[in-house]
Amino acid sequence: MAATVDEHAASEVLKGISRHLNCLNEENKLTRKRALESIKNQTVSKELPSDVLQEVFSSLLKPLLKCLSDPMEKCRETTIAIITDFIRCVPKPEEALPYLMPCLAQRFGDKEILEPSEEIRLLAVEMLALTVEVCGRHLAPYLNEMTNILKRTIVDPFPDVKKESCKCTVSFAKSVPEHFHMQAENLVKPLMQTITHQHSRVRVSVIEATGAVIQHGSGKNMDDVLSHLAQRLFDDSPQVRKAVTAVVGDWLLNMRDRYSYFHKLIPLLLTSISDEIPEIRLLAADLWRQAGLQWEKENEDDIKDKMDFLLSPPPHYPPGVDRPGLGCRELVVRNLSRLVPAIAHDVTDWLVPTRVRTSQLLSVLLLHAEDHTTQHLQPLLAVLYRACSDTERDVVNNCLAAAKLIGTFVPPPVFLKLMLEHVMTPNSPSYPWTPLMVLAAVLGGGSKPLLNPHLQQIADTLVQPEVSQEYQQVMYLEQLLACVDVLLYQCEADCGLISLQLLQVLVTIQSLSNDPQLSAKALESVHLLSKVQGLDSIELYRQHMGQLLDWLSASVNTWSSYSPQRLQLHIILMQSGPVPGEFLNQLMPLLHSCLQPNRDTEMRMSVFTMLAKLLLDAKNTLDSQGHFCDEAERFLSDVLLPNLVWHAGRTAAAVRTSALSCLLALLHGGAITPGQLLSLEVKLSPLVLSALDENSQMSRLLACRCLSATLKLIGTSLHHEALNKIYPELLKRLDDSSEEVRNIALETMDLWLSGLTKDYNPDLCAPHLQLLFQQLLLHLDDPDSSVQDRVLEVLKKGSRVHPSLLQREAEAVRDKQRSPHHCDLLLQHISSLPHTTCSNRPT
């Protein structure tokens, strides 16, 4: 009875709109528009009973579908609105599908878009989404039509159409899960074409649709999809990254064939655990925890034997880090062999964000793998070595954090067996420091009790010449220093066992470094090495000086200007204060060997310069024990004098200059006694006097200073013949081109005259004195008044030696000088002297 009533009501409605239906075929577009509006007002807008609407819809559907091709946009828009309202209101919308779906497929699913209006295409897709929602599984027979439509609308130029199409795809996949897989792969390509759209909301919708398509698909396109999703993990939009995280987590939990894809899905989800946005990190961690728990339940029988000991954390677990659940750890462990090669590939990607995220992922994986890392140590180390040469600092820091976990979870005997070999023979000649860099990080993650038995092995490797002396790059030396520092901080007082080796390495770093900051850091480490043993740095050197000198002496015969040993010697002697004076019996043979005239010239210059610094402060260095005098005479005769012998060439001249500076320091520093010097004066004086004629101003200056120092020490003990050989050479220097040399020559002449004793017979040596006075009187008329003043003072000293001779010579030249002023002052001074005879002798 009710059906009859509904049929009658529907018939009445249809009669009322029959004229409007006829008008739909009119040529006048306004007529068609008004007809459609009237149909809408008298049907769906009238709130008729649903059964009545069902009957009316069945009769109106075909005419309405024809209107989808109406030339007038407003007519098409109204038509879609009417059909949409009918689908929403009728109890059995699926009855319209046989006519609706082919029409929509023809209009919106062809290769070329027939509908030019973006807004109408959007309304059509919204209508399609509603159809999927209300018809559900009834759409299964129209799988091809739906797929064709979505293939086109997903790549529609209008962003809103794309988004609505993606939502429709998700709904459709869930509505017909048993059939969707047959066409799912046809939607992958348009989705991947759209996944890089400029609008982030579109990208989010595409990712969500991709999740549904793969979830309910056959899995054939998983690899293509994953590569695109992996790129979206680096998206600038947090919402996009969050969508990827949610989709991947859902796959891990719910995809039918998820076990086959664990090794591909796990890296994506774990990458999000390191995301910069807390919300994404929390979401990823929660999904990962759920995946682990689910895996535990599904594999309970396999892991029940491991439950007891796998639940307790390993010793020395990183503080402040939450340990992942058993299921999560097992998931990583069982897939690690397939994950490590992927990490190795991506960590060298050309895109910086990819390398950064991959390096972050490595730490997360190792935190899950724990002691299972041991099984994959070789490829993991290769990854770390390669990544630590990256120019991006974040990549390097992340990899060093991962390396620290290796030290935490892998036993030292295992990682040292591989790593020390890599340190000895780096695989990359361009980046030889990476094994040291990784070793320092690994040692930093180790524990003191486990490292202690291996300290000797580590230190013996670091001190090897091919490790500590082979490379001079600052980066290499920094990493070598980092290895020493980490041992000092990790093992502290136990480093006393390897104190010598560590000191040797630190000395080598300082000797090879051209970077003042690095040298300063190495010196700080020397102080730390002292401190952990309860010593100061001087005591540390005292403890090891004998061994250090033996270490250097072993190779002294092969030293050259390029040998690091000469620089090591410099560092040791300059930093050890008074200690060298306690080991002269070992030090002096070493110095004798490397300073022989036949040895490398630049090396000798370097060593002489160093010795000059030490000898100037001999009481606090080489002569700290007062024993250097026992070696001084031999050092002077066998080392210094042979290096003062003249040889042609600039390099030979430079060696003589450095030897003169060392001689001067020896004379000034008080490390040689007057008696020792006097015994060698016959050999020494000719060489020093010869140096007064050197081309080098510095050599002439040093030679003058050496004569001055010699006269101070033994001037009063020299025989008159020795004295008479000195002054002619000094007189030549009064005409030197260097004012400084002239000044020192005058000072030395002053000392020469002051040092004359009663043993010097002025009458016997009158010709010498006459020549001396004549030359000095010439310079008394020097254009430089300051020189005149200094010469006057020297002549006043000479007036005490033979005043009458000087008076005669002064009177003879007085009238020849440009100004007699200084001559008059000299004569006045001589007149004021006590009465003397011509044969007066100095007192």
Language-model segments: which ranges?
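Extended, low-complexity, acidic/polar intrinsically disordered regions
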Residues: 1-843
